């Protein structure tokens, strides 16, 4: 067993809804800890999956996910032969680190950010350098991240918008940073929450063709409401594309996943309606936080990062009323996914006590 992972803690999943109801005696539980969508997927998804013939069950699925590959390539205007699919973006994060990192390497990440980047570096016995974000705005410190690059740096991770801060960096700032990096350093831009961004200059996905050391990740778990189906994809150039295709598990997306994803992508009007609801609720919640003098960062996602003093105490108070939020990331900050109107108003009433 690798010494670096011998004492690694397992992922702590959300408490089952039934357990929360039984423990706290509540009739309604709002799952707002994993940034899932309270609105669910497009109404086209369920019927599409149910229409899949039982005849396919005895055969392996399309190992190239051809229908999904074509749908994503058309929607995002990228080369279909630059797409690698995975069971959520999580699988692609794991594969990228496995393919790129060696025990002598280091990776650079903002702090705070999504914990899986450092976790998978640890599994590969690489070192992670964490660079604090701007404490006032939450923006990534690109200068400090560049200064941290050395001869052993092989990857830089950038969640954009960042998780858990929700803060968004512009395409121009990202490309300026990328252009300074050595070609030997791969910049992975994780755009899991891109669909919620309402600013221009929002994505670098179509810049991959111009930069061999740029990779972009996406997921259908958030705005598309398909967290249970586990669908993610990455856009990258050769030779990384071919190596990733060789290393990933064959048939890693089944027919139901592929069919549901294609149906979801075909319904952009539904996606737009979800994003509009999230934006409206985000703006109202931020107005509440400003009015009551909570520190938070301006978000371009479906969640908020809020300083509350004692995260565990506030998290327990919310959970006791049926609101599951994430209080495990920082001792003083909580991450709250935006729920329905009534859920958000209910959480605000509780936050007034702190």
UniProtKB/Swiss-Prot annotation:
Matching InterPro entries, A to Z?
Aminotransferase_I/II_large, HisP_aminotrans, HistidinolP_aminotransfase, PyrdxlP-dep_Trfase, PyrdxlP-dep_Trfase_major, PyrdxlP-dep_Trfase_small
Tell me the pathway.
Answer: Amino-acid biosynthesis; L-histidine biosynthesis; L-histidine from 5-phospho-alpha-D-ribose 1-diphosphate: step 7/9
Q: Per UniProt, what is the name of the gene that codes for the protein in this document? A: hisC
EC number in record: 2.6.1.9
According to the entry, what is the taxonomic lineage of the organism?
A: Bacteria, Bacillati, Bacillota, Bacilli, Lactobacillales
Q: What is this protein called?
A: Histidinol-phosphate aminotransferase
Which NCBIfam families does this one have?
A: hisC (TIGR01141)
Question: Which reaction is catalysed here?
Answer: L-histidinol phosphate + 2-oxoglutarate = 3-(imidazol-4-yl)-2-oxopropyl phosphate + L-glutamate
Q: Which organism is it from?
A: Leuconostoc citreum (strain KM20)
Gene3D superfamilies, A to Z: Aspartate Aminotransferase, domain 1, Type I PLP-dependent aspartate aminotransferase-like (Major domain)
């Amino acid at each position: 067993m690798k010494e670096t992972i011998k004492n690694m803690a397992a992922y702590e999943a959300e408490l089952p809804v039934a357990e929360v109801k039984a423990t706290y005696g509540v009739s309604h539980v709002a799952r707002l800890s994993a940034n899932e969508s309270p609105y669910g997927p497009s109404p086209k998804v369920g019927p599409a999956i149910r229409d899949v013939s039982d005849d396919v069950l005895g055969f392996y699925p399309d190992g190239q996910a051809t229908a999904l590959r074509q749908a994503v390539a058309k929607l995002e205007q990228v080369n279909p032969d630059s797409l690698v699919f995975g069971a959520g973006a999580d699988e692609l994060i794991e594969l990228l680190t496995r393919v790129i990192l060696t025990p002598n390497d280091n990776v650079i990440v903002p702090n705070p950010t999504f914990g899986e980047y450092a976790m998978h570096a640890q599994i590969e016995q690489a070192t992670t350098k964490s660079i604090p974000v701007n404490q006032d705005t939450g923006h990534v410190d690109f200068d400090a991240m560049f200064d941290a690059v050395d001869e052993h740096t092989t990857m830089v991770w950038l969640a954009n918008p960042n998780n858990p801060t929700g803060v968004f960096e512009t395409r121009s700032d990202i490309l300026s940073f990328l252009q300074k990096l050595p070609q030997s350093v791969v910049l992975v831009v994780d755009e899991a929450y891109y669909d919620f961004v309402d600013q221009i200059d929002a994505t670098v996905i179509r810049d991959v063709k111009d930069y061999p050391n740029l990779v972009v990740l996406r997921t259908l778990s958030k705005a598309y409401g398909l967290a249970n189906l586990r669908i993610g994809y990455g856009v990258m150039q050769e030779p990384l594309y071919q190596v990733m295709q060789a290393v990933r598990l064959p048939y890693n997306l089944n027919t139901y996943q592929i069919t549901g994803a294609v149906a979801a992508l075909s319904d952009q009007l539904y996606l737009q309606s979800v994003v509009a609801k999230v934006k409206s609720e985000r703006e109202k919640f931020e107005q509440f936080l400003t009015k009551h003098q909570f520190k938070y960062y301006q978000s371009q996602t479906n969640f908020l990062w809020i300083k509350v003093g004692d995260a565990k105490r506030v998290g327990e108070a919310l959970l006791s009323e049926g609101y599951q939020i994430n209080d495990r990331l920082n001792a003083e900050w909580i991450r709250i996914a935006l729920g329905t109107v009534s859920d958000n108003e209910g959480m605000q009433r509780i936050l007034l006590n702190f």
